[in-house]
Regions:
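N-terminal loops that bind phosphate or other acidic moieties
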Residues: 507, 511-517, 521-553, 558-570, ...
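N-terminal active-site wall of soluble small-molecule enzyme domains
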Residues: 70-82, 103, 564-614
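Active-site mouth loops of central-metabolism enzymes
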Residues: 17-39, 90-102, 167-185, 259-274, ...
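Catalytic domains of carbohydrate-active enzymes, especially glycoside hydrolases
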Residues: 38-61, 193-197, 284, 541-563
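Catalytic alpha/beta core domains of metabolic enzymes, predominantly
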Residues: 65-304, 313-319, 367-398, 405-412, ...
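Metallocofactor- and cofactor-centric catalytic cores in central/energy metabolism, strongly enriched
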Residues: 385-501, 530-533, 540-556, 564-574, ...
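Extended, intrinsically disordered, low-complexity segments
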Residues: 2-10, 147, 296, 314-396, ...
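N-terminal beta1-alpha1-beta2 module of alpha/beta enzyme domains
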Residues: 3-63
Length: 817
């Protein structure tokens, strides 16, 4: 069956060595080379292939070499129409060179519709005649694919996991680099690609067995477990490929003078032998398979594999035939297996100048930043229509063009790139340089007159304290297109660029067992048995998607609430919380957990499990501690570092109007919780007060003169934030509760609710992170509605205004019957 032949299953389970073959159209967009190969394979279903090899599929490049060719989507359409694929997987290359993110998303949707699962995500070759796009590069593309997979999972119905389409995305890596910066940047970027969602690797073409072995050693040394497919290109003088690679006409590919001369002196059979020897080499050193390219003649392809099978794993006698390095070489590992020492360059004048300027006026930890920002604000430079803005922007553009070849992206990554611009100083204008096209000397393969920007960035990073590790860990997000041609300095200073964060401390709410769909999937997961939280499954993938998407959306804490399971079985909730805390620690990208429960035993279990690891973790949050549980929970601070949400509720009878707690009572509770927390060693910044959200749909006082719940919640926040002692504490609300039972526009209501609460001092919230509260514009009418409820102090006039606005809102959102 075809499902059993998918590349993912073969790489993971097959005892045979996987082979995929790269097929391209001929001159003048000719499909016949692809058709001829596939028909030859179909004639005997691969029975002429060696028994210990399995042909898993075909890969379809997208405009290789930057030259227009048949698009993979069109090739797939013909293959499907003529039923040429049989049991083979179809693995299209998808690149960002010719398409923006909208177009890439459409392509992914089309592949999903066709059932294409395996894809190879690449930056792509720079077009030779057309204008490249490169809105994202390989890391951004992999992130887009991962987001597509997550959305598909999150939209799936419980129990239907077998029908959920998931892309199996691969990425490229080139170990065939001979300068330290080029090589290390390839390995760093490889790690970033894996973090972004790459599930298998395909190497670049190259003929240096030491470099191939070096890649496998690097993966092992760094405990990276991922299938590796070696790229075996049939290099033969029957085609112009050797000459083009030698003459740097195919950037990223290297054929030395010696190799070219050797090829020209050899027969075709000797060319076949070299490809076979390389396959045997990859098989012996631990690769999971090979990608064979440059072969459109099926009998030749079979001959290569048969010869490789004869060699088996005894490839060492052919080392010299697979060793064609550059003249000047850098190898990460010495012959004895030890890692070579990396360079320790000194800062250049440019580095020192950039660091000085950045620290002086652009580092928020230094006074100059705040003085500079206030000065620009004083002159109105934050408004694009002002003359001051235009004058400043003109000066900035001129200066930055002279210094950094600035291209006015408006979303500047100079600090992240150690003072180098990856648009103006890179031929592809990439977010995460380099691309892999550099020559063996480190020059740009697309412009031999300039050194690859990756070389500059690496050398500058190496000159900074911990710079290499920072470079290794840092991934730049795609730039914000709408900021192009605006002032990047103004955008940075006023939080409009990629550094923009929500003004709220976001406590992500999605992992909550009381949410019907989520609770059902949690139950389904738990029913899978003792290894449910470690064995791959649809429900576990769903939970992982919840965790990762919330982390990507800027969560500061990832909340887990399992109280729905603890209603009948408290011990079950305790054990489940331990498992979910592990999952957040594993997949939360360093974001701490918020253990959310009304059961103190669950809180304690989650807190202890969070620290049950040898890895460093950030302090978690407990939600919640009440005044009457403080003496049980707060002593844990001595052993475990954590912050907490102090819920402003009490077991005492309310004394406020209408039998509810007044603002004074709620404020008094906050003061008492604060005093307790100080006794147990908490800082004010580790306390989050929750004055409780009441749905505005039912926020109607039952007696005259009684303030509304929204009024009390907001006024309590005001009191806390204006108190000399409590003002450094945080105020948090469960925002999504405010829109419950409303007929529509719930997200807009939540946005307006947050905006109004922030006016009162709200600085944290249990929220749906995808709504990006505090960053998107609020509807004025909805803000007026929330303002009316926030002002409902018990007077008839305020009550009447709130009810009138609610009536108008319901009338405008009611759906026709």
């Amino acid at each position: 069956m075809k499902d059993q032949k998918r590349l993912k299953n073969i790489l993971a389970e097959s005892s045979r060595f996987a082979v995929i073959v790269e097929l391209t159209g001929g001159p003048n967009y000719n499909f016949s080379p692809i058709e001829k190969f596939l028909k030859s394979y179909q004639e005997n279903q691969g029975r002429d292939l060696p028994s210990d090899f399995i042909l898993a599929g075909i890969t379809l490049p997208q405009n290789p070499g930057g030259v227009a060719n048949i698009d993979p989507s069109d090739v797939i359409a013909v293959i499907e129409k003529e039923r040429l694929a049989g049991d083979l997987d179809i693995i299209p290359h998808i690149t960002s060179k010719d398409a923006n993110t909208d177009s890439l998303t459409s392509t992914l949707a089309g592949y999903r519709r066709r059932g294409i699962e395996s894809i190879l995500a690449l930056t792509g070759d720079k077009p030779t005649t057309a204008q490249g796009v490169f809105e994202v590069e390989s890391i951004g593309l992999l992130s887009l694919i991962k987001q597509h997979n997550q959305n598909t999972l999150l939209n799936a119905k419980p129990g239907g996991w077998n029908q959920v389409h998931q892309f199996y995305a691969g990425a490229a890596v080139s170990p065939f680099k001979y300068t330290e910066p080029s090589l290390m940047q390839q390995y760093y970027k490889m790690e970033k690609k894996i973090a972004a969602g790459a599930e298998f690797l395909i190497t670049q073409v190259g003929w240096d067995w030491k470099k191939s072995l070096e890649l496998m050693q690097y993966l092992k040394e760094n405990r990276i477990s991922i299938p590796v497919i070696g790229n075996v290109y049939w290099l033969s003088t029957l085609t112009p490929a050797p000459r083009l690679m030698h003459d740097i006409k195919l950037p990223g590919c290297f054929v030395s003078d010696a190799l070219l001369a050797q090829l020209q002196s050899e027969s075709v059979d000797q060319h076949i032998d070299r490809a076979a020897q390389q396959i045997a080499m990859y098989r012996a050193i631990g690769a999971t398979g090979v990608d064979v390219g440059g072969v459109h003649d099926y009998p030749t392809f079979v001959k290569i594999l048969q010869r490789a099978a004869e060699i088996g794993t005894n490839w060492q006698p052919y080392k010299d035939n697979l060793y064609w390095p550059a003249e000047k070489t850098f190898y990460l590992y010495e012959d004895n297996g030890r890692q070579a020492s990396l360079s320790k360059p000194c800062k250049k004048c440019r580095d020192r100048f950039f660091d000085f300027m950045h620290l002086s006026i652009l580092d928020p930890d230094y006074p100059g930043f705040h003085v500079f920002k206030k000065t620009l604000k004083l002159f109105g430079a934050q408004k694009e229509s002002n003359f001051t803005y235009k004058a400043f922007n003109a000066i900035e553009k001129s200066f930055k063009y002279l210094m950094f070849e600035c291209q006015e992206c408006g979303d500047c990554y100079l600090p992240e790139n150690f003072g180098y611009c990856t648009i103006g100083e890179c031929e592809k204008g990439m977010d995460n340089a380099p691309c892999g096209d550099a020559t063996v000397e480190g020059y740009c393969g697309n412009n031999l007159n300039r050194l690859c920007i990756g070389e500059y960035i690496y050398n500058s990073a190496s000159a900074h304290k911990n710079g290499r590790e920072k470079l290794r860990q840092m991934t730049n997000k795609p730039r914000i297109p709408s900021l192009e041609h605006t002032s990047s300095l103004v955008n940075y200073l006023f939080g409009k660029d990629h550094t923009m964060r929500s003004p709220l401390i976001q406590i992500a709410e999605a992992i909550h067992a009381s949410i019907p769909k989520t609770g059902k999937i949690m139950k389904e997961l738990h029913a899978l048995g003792a290894d449910a939280y470690t064995r791959p499954s649809g429900p576990l993938d769903y939970v992982r998607a919840l965790i990762e998407t919330q982390a990507d959306e800027g969560a500061d804490y990832i909340a887990v609430n399992l109280d729905a399971f603890g209603e009948d079985n408290p011990d079950m909730a305790v054990e489940m919380m331990k498992e979910y805390v592990k999952l957040v620690r594993q997949w939360g990208k360093g974001i701490p957990v918020c253990v959310d429960s009304s059961n103190d035993d669950v809180l304690i279990a989650g807190l202890k499990e969070w620290y049950n690891t040898d890895q460093p973790v950030r302090p978690p949050q407990l939600n919640s501690i009440k005044l009457f549980t403080a003496d049980k929970m707060m002593p844990l601070k001595k052993q475990y570092d954590f912050c907490f949400i102090g819920l402003l509720v009490t077991e005492d009878k309310a004394k406020g109007p209408g039998g509810s707690h007044s603002v004074e009572e709620l404020f008094d509770l906050a003061q008492q919780i604060y005093a307790k927390a100080m006794q147990y060693g908490f800082k004010a910044s580790e306390i989050f007060f929750d004055s409780t959200v009441f749905p505005i749909a039912i926020d109607m006082p039952m007696e005259p003169g009684v303030p509304g719940y929204t009024y009390r919640a907001f006024e309590t926040i005001k009191r806390i934030k204006s108190d000399p002692k409590l003002k450094h504490c945080h105020c948090s609300l469960g925002v999504s509760n405010c829109c419950r039972d409303l007929p529509g526009r719930k997200i807009g209501i939540c946005r307006a609710y947050v905006a109004k609460a922030m006016e009162c001092g709200l600085d944290a919230g249990i929220v749906n992170t995808s709504h990006q509260y505090g960053l998107k514009e609020v509807d004025e009418e909805l803000l007026q509605l929330i303002s009316a409820y926030a002002a409902m102090d018990g007077s008839p006039e305020k009550l009447n205004e709130a009810m009138t606005r609610m009536g108008q809102f319901c009338a405008s959102t009611r759906k026709p019957t």
